Curated annotation (Swiss-Prot):
Gene Ontology terms for molecular function: 4-phosphoerythronate dehydrogenase activity; NAD binding; protein dimerization activity
Pathway(s) annotated for this protein in UniProt: Cofactor biosynthesis; pyridoxine 5'-phosphate biosynthesis; pyridoxine 5'-phosphate from D-erythrose 4-phosphate: step 2/5
Function: Catalyzes the oxidation of erythronate-4-phosphate to 3-hydroxy-2-oxo-4-phosphonooxybutanoate.
CDD domains, sorted: ErythrP_dh
Catalytic activity, reaction form: 4-phospho-D-erythronate + NAD(+) = (R)-3-hydroxy-2-oxo-4-phosphooxybutanoate + NADH + H(+)
Residue ranges that the Swiss-Prot or TrEMBL entry lists as coiled coil: none
Localization (cell): Cytoplasm
Species name: Shewanella sp. (strain W3-18-1)
Residues making up the signal peptide according to the UniProt record: none
Gene3D superfamilies listed in its UniProt record: 3.30.1370.170, NAD(P)-binding Rossmann-like Domain
The name this protein goes by in its record: Erythronate-4-phosphate dehydrogenase
GO cellular component: cytoplasm
Keyword Oxidoreductase: yes
Length: 376
């Protein structure tokens, strides 16, 4: 069995090596000829899977995407051809939630404006939005949720309108899929009018899709409103972001919010489980066996951390400033965006870091944030 796999997908060999011949490929430049004789195709969001790509393949047994979203896959076409498909919903939700939370802590430190006491509006209450809310609520932050689709579906959580979030939230964090048509279209959800209407000193964090914000309008508005603070992990026109927008962001990264080692391992592992199910064979590999031990064994706390100390703990796991600095130095280079994504060092999640502190009740919130070993 020939398994064609994106070269940037981790842990493929230990998971799929027993199932067939693994052929790594560049997902962004994948051709019809390369796919022609594949039995299994494993992709990421950079690969458009459609009739054009699969036109010469008549033996494909499974398409898997190690991603939350599916907008890069023509699901109707796969359905017509009876080709099984699976993605990995929620695989990197924890990573995105922690990234957004860390970014807010970094902004708080940089501008001497504590995160504690602010109101955060989360637009999109799916896997990543929920993970972001979990971090914030663990830290005691008031969260407003906006998700008209989930609200209509009867989700029991309390929701507010986007206009309410714009009026009341100090921070807005975006976590919606890209939808280009319909009642709940998200393309340019934040257009020039809404960007202009943001309350003074709003922090805007985008970890979902670049097209959710009108990037040209964002440049115009930001140039007139220096009070707005931007954290941008996604961009219109990826992998070529607007060169004039990057310098206007307080933190800028190349679509890597979900790039934790745990998240990427989960994505590949979920596809492994699905393929084993389709082939009717036992999935006998373990996710835990894939992950290396963290380079810091444990951190002993003398007191419950304040916000400054919490940021330091977060930086032990992931220092956003490093990726921000690297991206600014590389994004104008040819293939700089993709090169940084490909060579990303796969940060760890909070769960990789064990904390030791005697007074459990004072630090339960650290356990809720995701740190391990607290109070043990």
């Amino acid at each position: 069995m020939k398994i064609l796999v994106d070269e940037n997908m981790p842990f493929v060999e230990p998971l799929f090596g027993d199932l067939g011949e693994i052929i790594p490929v560049n997902g962004r430049t994948l051709t019809v000829a390369q796919v022609r004789d594949a039995d299994v195709l494993l992709v990421r969001s950079v690969t458009k899977v459609n009739a054009e790509l699969l036109s010469d393949n008549h033996q494909l047994k499974f398409v898997g995407s190690a991603t939350i979203g599916t907008d890069h896959v023509d699901l109707a076409y796969l359905g017509e051809r009876n080709i099984p498909f699976s993605n990995a919903p929620g695989c990197n939700a924890t990573a995105v939630g922690e990234f957004a939370f860390i970014a807010m802590l970094e902004l708080a430190q940089r501008f001497d404006s504590p995160l504690k006491g602010k109101v955060v509006g989360i637009v999109g209450a799916g896997n990543t939005g929920t993970a972001t809310a979990k971090c914030l609520q663990a830290y005691g932050i008031k969260v407003l949720l906006n998700d008209p689709i989930k609200e209509k579906q009867g989700d029991p959580r309390s929701f507010v309108s986007l206009e309410t979030i714009m009026a009341q939230a100090d921070i807005i964090s975006l976590h919606v899929p890209i939808t280009r048509t319909g009642e709940h279209k998200t393309k340019h959800l934040l257009d020039e009018a809404r960007l202009t209407a943001l309350k003074p000193n709003t922090w805007l964090v985008n970890c979902c899709r670049g097209d959710v914000i009108d990037n040209k309008a964002l440049v115009r508005v930001k140039r007139q409103r220096d009070d707005l603070r931007l954290v941008l992990d996604v961009w219109e026109g990826e992998p070529t972001p607007m060169p004039e927008l990057v310098p206007l962001a307080e933190f800028a990264t190349p679509h890597i919010a979900g790039y934790s080692l745990e998240g990427k391992a989960r994505g590949t592992f979920m596809l492994y489980q699905k393929l084993c199910q389709l082939l009717n064979i036992a999935a006998d590999k373990s996710l835990l066996d894939l992950l290396p031990s963290f380079n810091i064994k444990a951190v002993e706390l003398a007191t419950a951390p304040d916000e400054k100390a919490l940021l330091q703990l977060a930086r032990f796991v992931y220092d956003l400033r490093d990726d921000d600095n690297m991206f600014r130095n590389i994004f104008l280079n040819e293939n700089g965006f993709d090169t940084m994504r490909k060579n990303h060092r796969h940060r760890r999640e909070f769960s990789a870091l064990a904390l030791a502190y005697d007074r459990q009740l004072e630090v339960d919130w650290l356990s809720n944030l995701g740190f391990s070993g607290v109070g043990q």
